[in-house]
Each structure stands twice: as structure tokens, then as C-alpha cells.
Amino acid sequence: MRRLLMNRNLSPLCRSVLRFIDLSVCRAMACFLDCFRARDNRSTSNLVSHSSLANSRKAQDSQNDLSALFLSEEKSASSPCLDKERFDLDSIHIDKGLRDEARFLKACGTIPETPIEIRKASQKLSPQHSGSSHFHSWISSSSSMGSRLAESSTPMKACEEVGRPSFTSEQTASSCVIDVRDNARISSASSDGTEVESVGTAIKGELDRTARPTFTAGKNKSVRFECDLDQSNSSNSSENGSSRKPEMGGKICFTVSSPNPTPLKLSDEMQTPGTIYPANMESGGRGRPRIRSQFVHSVSNIMENASLYKVYKDSHEGLDYEEQIEAETPSSETYGEKVEESSDEKLSKFEASFSPWLNQINENIAALNERTPGVGVITPGDRPIIGLVAAQWIENEQTEISPKMWDGNGIPNSTTKYKEDQKVSWHATPFEVRLEKALSEEGGQSLFPQRKLEVMMEEVEGDTDISQLHHSVQPNSVVSF
């Protein structure tokens, strides 16, 4: 178009027509483009406005839901006498996710209980106080609840699960139901995470047969009961060998296995380390619970018991001897018989307690004798002579050895013929006495006389000749036969 307008050969009319067409087309295109640009801007602005409105609406909805939840709880806590239908209608609008979140926080331990449960329990504990101004903190409310529970004396529920049926399946770490008549003292110490939670409970008062203290604990929890029921009339006692000991004097004992050995029968004087668990509390009837600590003393070993048995036996033998002496007189015949019977009964009872050990010792001795049959009683001749150490063995004994078997040194020997100690016992007589006696007997002889070796040699030669003669005679006799 512009080239045609620049052409000089065209007439002015044609140029004016072309200019009009050009301007109209340009304006039409500009209007068309302006329309498209306006639509794009409007669409982007509309999208941004819609997203912001949606976010704000969601935030408002969540805030409205949270406010509705807390408002409904406040209303139900401030006015406990309202009908449950109103609470159900308000809870319909509460989002299910909020309930799940509350359950999750309750299970994790972030909050001990939901606000409505705390308020319901506190309303039942103290109905005269109403309003939400008393519940600024959950911790303070729980502590006040524990103090009010300790002060109250009527049967009550410490923690109650209220609301929908979905809440009935949950059991919190501090929920417990106790039914007592006089007083209840509960001291609990709980810790978060993996720490061990311990609950110590001491109950004083009469316990119903139907009422049983139950504890529904959380992760790790140890409960210790120490109860001892004193009953005037004990009846309906069922024995359970795995978890109960025999009942003595109307007392029920629930025991647990202990590291130390304990006797089979228990009495009031004995103390055992068993922890008492009221597993079958309803069979105990009514009585006054008593708390007492129990310990155990280990049984002495075999050697100590053997020594005690020996001492007891010696004393018993001395007592029997005295009883026999007293029984010789006619006035003490009946008394001696009674004492003998009682002492025999005591000895039999005492020996019965040691019977397994004594039988085992006798069996060991018999087995040892079977293994070594050649070992017998050591005679005085077989006793070793160790100088003056063995002097006490033959101090009061008379020597049976012939005088020919003694030598000059006092040692028995059949090859010598000295007579120095024929009448003197070497081991019993001191050296000074023997020396004086030897000097007095010898008189003017020398202190150390020489031995007669020639006589000994002659006797040895004579013995050899006689033996040779016997050997020579025997073969001839054999040949003659």
C-alpha cells in the first residue's frame, strides 16, 4: 500500500482512496490486538484472584472448624447439663481430620488427654466450680485433679473417656478406675519416650469382692502391690500352686520366684522377697489391708549344717548320759522316759532335715571303700616314726618288740644285738634320762663301745652253710624217689 502511495504516476483520487483503506485497516488491526491483550490480562488477574480467594476460604474454613471444635468443647464443658444431641449436631460439622490429629497427639504423648475429657473429669470432681476460667493449663488441671482425687472419699472415676464410640477403644497412660470405701492414695510418676513409668499404689480400706483395682498402662509400666489381709473368718480360699503359697492364719500371699532359696512352707515369722500381686483379690473377702516389707535369708551350706549337726549330736549324747544317770534313781523314772521320748523325737526331726546330705555322704564313703579295699586300720606298728613328732602315739603304750630287735641307736633292727635301750622307750623318755641311765648301767665302760663285727660275720657264714646244705639235700631226695 505504501509503495502504491509513493508512486507519482497515480492520480490524487487513487491516493486518497488508498490512504483511507490503509488507515482503516491499521485501526481495525489495532483494535483487534487491543481486544486480545485485554482478555489475556483479565484472565491472568482472574486466575490470581481465584487462587487467593480459595486459599483464604480454606484458611477461614480451617479456622472456623478449629473454632467450632473449641467452641463446642467450651460449651459442653461450661454447661454439662445440656443434651447430648446438641453436642452431636455441633460435632457433625467438625472435620474428621481434626479428630484424627487430636487422637495422634494424644497417642504420642504431646497432650495427656483431650480438653473435653479433662474438663468432664474435673466437672465431676468439683461440680460447684463451673466455667472455663479455671482451666488455663492442662497440666495444672491434671494436678488439681490428682489432689482432688486424694481428698475425696466417695467412689469415683479418675479419668473417663467421653464422646463418640471411637474414643471408647483408646486407653490413655493415666486412665485408671479405683473403687474404694475409705481412702485412696495414688502416686504416679510418668516419663515421655522410652523411659520406664512406675506407678506406686497404696490402698487402705475395705475392698469389695466385685471391685478389683485395674490399671491400664501405656508402654512400660510396673505396678507393685503389697497387701496383707487380716481376716477374722477366712473362707473360700482356692489354692493355686503356680502363683500362691499356702495360706497361714487367714492371710493371702501372692509370691513371685526369687533368686534366693526359700522354704516350702511359710509362716508369719518368715520373710520372703515375693512381690504380692492381687491377681485373685475377690477370693480374699473383706479385711484390713496392711503394708509390710519382706526379705529373705539364704540357707546355710552343707558344711555349716554338718557342723551344727555334730554339735547338736554331742550335746544330745551328753544329755542322754545325764538322763541315764538320773534314771537310775526311782524318783526320776517317769521323768526320764518323757525326756527320752521328746529328745528322740527332736533328734529324728533334726536328722530328717539332714537325711539327703547324710545319705549322700554315706554313699560317697562306701564308694571310696570299694575303690580301695586293701586300706585298713593303721596299727601301732605301721605308724611312721618321725622323731619326737610321733612320741604321743606310744607314750602310754608298752612295747611288744623283743630286746634282740633293738640296736644301739634305739631304732628297731634285727641285725644288731646291742642292749643299750632294752628297758628304755626311745620316743617316750627324754634324752637326758636315757643318757643318765645308759651311763649308770655301763659303769666304767666307754661311752661308745665298739661293735663286735667278728661275731656277726661268723653268724652270717653259718647261715650260708646251712642254706647250702639244704639245697644239696633236696635234689638227692628227688632222685631217690
Swiss-Prot record:
Disruption phenotype: Diploid pollen grains (dyads of spores instead of tetrads) due to defective meiosis II. Abnormal spindle orientation at meiosis II. GO terms for biological process: male meiosis II; microsporogenesis; regulation of DNA-templated transcription. Residues 226-250 are annotated as: Disordered. The keyword Transmembrane helix does not apply. It comes from the Eukaryota. Residues 232-241 have a biased composition (Low complexity). Keywords: Meiosis. Required for normal spindle orientation at male meiosis II and normal formation of tetrad of microspores. Acts as a positive regulator of PS1 in male sporogenesis. Not involved in female meiosis. Diploid male spores in jason mutants give rise to viable diploid pollen grains and spontaneous triploid plants in the next generation. This is Protein JASON. The gene is JASON.
